[in-house]
């Protein structure tokens, strides 16, 4: 039955909220979006909780996979023919765009979850026709099944594309596990339209041209910069500014930027030989019969030489299916002028180019076309610093190859996490500083050794709050987004972390000194990383004892101590906490509310809403507030692990009153006297209906023990977030 005959449709009860138009956030847009804490659970994962991807990947015949991928590169399909009979350029673009969404500020984006398969990325204008690349890979994905994730396959396909065209890559590591629905936590920008120029409503720029943090791309729907120029207006020097900002936010320096731009454009071509206005919608907006294909041209041929993707048209080099130094040869040999592609996009073409330097047509080798350069390519020629590097690479091809190989590996592996997560036979032996290396430990402590250390910590001058706060501060830097930070490595001892305001340097140094003395007195080989975590557990056990409960906080030894040489101090600046709701601290006043910042940190720490709730309640009664403040400490028995925070939060004997920015007073309803003070973070657990439901559970008389058990479980999760060896 046709669905286009609206008058013939039958009425049907339809009570499910099956699209995004009717949700509580439309009615109450200021509601906390707790859904970002509940993504990617096993209800959406078809593999089930017992599936171990690492074991599956390690059972692959890896050489066979690579051979199949290399064979695919030259197996052109009629439904989407390969340029010059080689899919290399398409596969490299797919891999680049999978990895290129990574931004260093919050570690989100990147290649490690296969998110290019889902909205919004699968429908970004800059990802045009990458749906075809993934469909070309489907026979290989189907063949190897659960052993090879889409996330790993897309990056490996990019590597094999380069190798099939004569370039030796630096290596490849597997270990990227697929997600199964769009990521709800990533902020891609406030714009409401694709490719919106700067200066309009919901603009991501302020001031002269200050890009909003944590964004890296210059426009909604682009991976990095606009190939036509800033806001579509060619000006290589202005584009160079955008490139420097964008690539820095992708964790790349100038040398890596030049290498990646040149290496990415040494092969393949851009597509703009047609009318973009006739293209069908992107995959998410396509008709059901299109089966997830977007940007279809149903009015003309629309494939091969007639493909339209970015609108820019042409190859960058003379031999687009061969790795060589031709990119720099053309860039510096010829003068270039601004032209328009058949699709109307601004691009640069050479003046008076020799015929032998012109690439041949993708379908007919008897025809030659002008090569082209984007505004980003011309930036390498016009920007003085970029030009120095580009000329050096032109004159030293081997240096260029090495720099590009390393930069490509970094681009495609940055968000995979530490080297301990790497899988497969092609993992490079060399340790790289951006991997945040941590040395392995060579000791194993017996239970008696651990008990002796715990007793020494318990008998030291350190308070419960000092022990717990220091362990928390060491572990809270962990980001589940790119798996950076955490307690392993004990980089809280090193610059810059030891001097971060949020770590209370004076208190931190006191605790570290005492712990180091204990380690020395006991002649213990234990790392400071392990000792800091062990000490936090001692503090919690003492607090539970003070509440009348005897517990043991699980402790998994095996953390190493990083050194300054192993640490790129500048790269850790982005991990510095400027807020921590768990310790009731804000470094400054922010436009974003304190409770939203708490949600942000909780999501990066991979906490559920329940875990976030129980941790807040426990941290408050342990007295771990920054600076020892009393905000939210709803107890007369600080240092005892009780459920007092939740009991008093939900007690109707009190009323709540604003008392300044992010400050509230809790007054006795009968007398009007102030009993406690609180922050917005504290109050949200009583005001938000979902969080209050959790708070009520922990306030119940029969859940005192459950509160302690759940707090310990959540605490151990935080301490072990970066223990990928467990």
Curated annotation (Swiss-Prot):
Gene3D superfamilies from the UniProt entry: 1.10.520.10, Peroxidase, domain 2
Biological processes per GO annotation: cellular response to hydrogen peroxide; hydrogen peroxide catabolic process
Entry's cofactor comment: Binds 1 heme b (iron(II)-protoporphyrin IX) group per dimer.
Gene Ontology terms: cellular component: cytosol
UniProt entry tagged with the keyword Metal-binding: yes
Coiled coil: none
NCBIfam families reported in the protein's UniProt record: cat_per_HPI (TIGR00198), PRK15061.1 (NF011635)
Oligomeric form and interacting partners: Homodimer or homotetramer.
Known role: Bifunctional enzyme with both catalase and broad-spectrum peroxidase activity.
Name assigned to this protein: Catalase-peroxidase
Species whose genome carries this gene: Vibrio campbellii (strain ATCC BAA-1116)
Gene name of the record: katG
């Amino acid at each position: 039955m046709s669905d286009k005959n609206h008058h013939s449709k039958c009425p049907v009860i339809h009570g499910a909220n099956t699209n995004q138009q009717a949700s509580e956030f439309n009615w109450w847009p200021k509601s906390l979006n707790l859904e970002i804490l509940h993504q990617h659970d096993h209800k959406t994962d078809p593999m089930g909780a017992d599936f171990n991807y690492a074991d599956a990947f390690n059972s692959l015949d890896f050489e066979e996979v690579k051979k199949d991928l290399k064979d695919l590169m030259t197996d052109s399909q009629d439904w989407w023919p390969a340029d010059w009979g080689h899919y290399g350029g398409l596969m490299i673009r797919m891999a680049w765009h999978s990895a290129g969404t990574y931004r260093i500020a919050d570690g989100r984006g990147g290649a490690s979850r296969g998110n290019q398969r889902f909205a919004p990325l699968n429908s970004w204008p800059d990802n045009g026709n990458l749906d075809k690349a993934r469909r070309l890979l489907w026979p290989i994905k189907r063949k190897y099944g659960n052993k090879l994730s889409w996330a790993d396959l897309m990056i490996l396909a990019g590597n094999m594309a380069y190798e099939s065209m004569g370039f030796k890559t630096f290596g490849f590591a597997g270990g990227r596990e697929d997600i199964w629905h769009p990521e709800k936590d990533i902020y891609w920008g406030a714009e409401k339209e694709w490719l919106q120029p700067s200066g309009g409503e919901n603009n991501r720029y302020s001031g002269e041209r200050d890009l909003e943090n944590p964004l890296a791309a210059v426009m909604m729907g682009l991976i990095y910069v606009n190939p036509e120029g800033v806001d579509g207006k060619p000006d290589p020097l202005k584009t160079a500014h955008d490139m420097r900002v964008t690539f820095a936010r992708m964790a790349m320096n100038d040398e890596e930027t030049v290498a990646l731009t040149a290496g990415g454009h040494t092969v393949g071509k851009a597509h703009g030989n047609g009318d973009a206005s006739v293209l069908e919608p992107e995959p998410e907006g396509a008709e059901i019969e299109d089966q997830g294909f977007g940007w279809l041209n149903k009015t003309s041929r629309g494939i091969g030489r007639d493909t339209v993707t970015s609108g820019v048209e042409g190859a960058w080099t003379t031999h687009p299916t061969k790795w060589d130094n031709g990119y720099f040869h053309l860039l510096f040999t010829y003068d270039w002028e601004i032209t328009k592609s058949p699709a109307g996009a601004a691009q640069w073409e050479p003046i008076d180019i020799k015929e032998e330097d012109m690439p041949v047509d993708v379908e007919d080798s008897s025809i030659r076309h002008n090569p082209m350069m984007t505004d980003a390519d011309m930036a390498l020629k016009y920007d003085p610093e970029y030009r120095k590097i580009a000329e050096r690479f032109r004159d030293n091809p081997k240096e260029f190859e090495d720099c590009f190989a390393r930069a490509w590996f970094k681009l495609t592996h940055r968000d995979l996490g530490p080297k301990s997560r790497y899988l497969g036979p092609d993992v490079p032996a060399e340790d790289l500083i951006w991997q945040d290396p941590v040395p392995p430990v060579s000791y194993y402590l017996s239970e008696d050794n651990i008990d002796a250390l715990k007793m020494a910590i318990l008998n030291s001058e350190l308070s419960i709050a000092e022990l717990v706060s220091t362990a928390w501060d060491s572990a809270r830097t962990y980001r589940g987004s790119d798996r950076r930070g955490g307690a392993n490595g004990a980089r809280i001892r090193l610059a810059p972390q030891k001097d971060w305001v949020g770590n209370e340097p004076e208190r931190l140094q006191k605790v570290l000194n005492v712990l180091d003395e204990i380690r020395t007195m006991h002649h213990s080989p234990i790392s400071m990383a392990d000792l800091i975590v062990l000490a936090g557990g001692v503090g919690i056990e003492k607090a539970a004892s003070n509440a009348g409960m005897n517990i043991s906080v699980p402790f998994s030894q095996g953390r190493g101590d990083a050194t300054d040489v192993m640490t790129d101090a500048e790269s850790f600046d982005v991990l510095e906490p400027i807020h921590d709701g768990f310790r009731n601290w804000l470094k400054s006043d922010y436009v974003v509310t304190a409770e939203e910042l708490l949600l942000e940190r909780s999501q990066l720490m991979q906490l559920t809403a329940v875990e976030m709730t129980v941790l807040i309640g426990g941290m408050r009664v342990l007295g771990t507030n920054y600076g020892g403040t009393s905000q939210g400490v709803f107890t007369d028995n600080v240092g005892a692990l009780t459920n007092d925070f939740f009991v008093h939060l939900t007690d109707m004997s009190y009323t709540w009153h604003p008392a300044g920015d992010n400050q509230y007073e809790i007054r006795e309803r009968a007398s009007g006297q102030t009993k406690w003070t609180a922050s917005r973070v504290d109050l949200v657990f009583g005001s938000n209906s979902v969080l209050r439901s959790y708070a009520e559970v922990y306030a119940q008389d029969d859940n005192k023990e459950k509160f302690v058990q759940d707090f310990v479980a959540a605490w151990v999760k935080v301490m072990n977030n970066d223990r990928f060896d467990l």
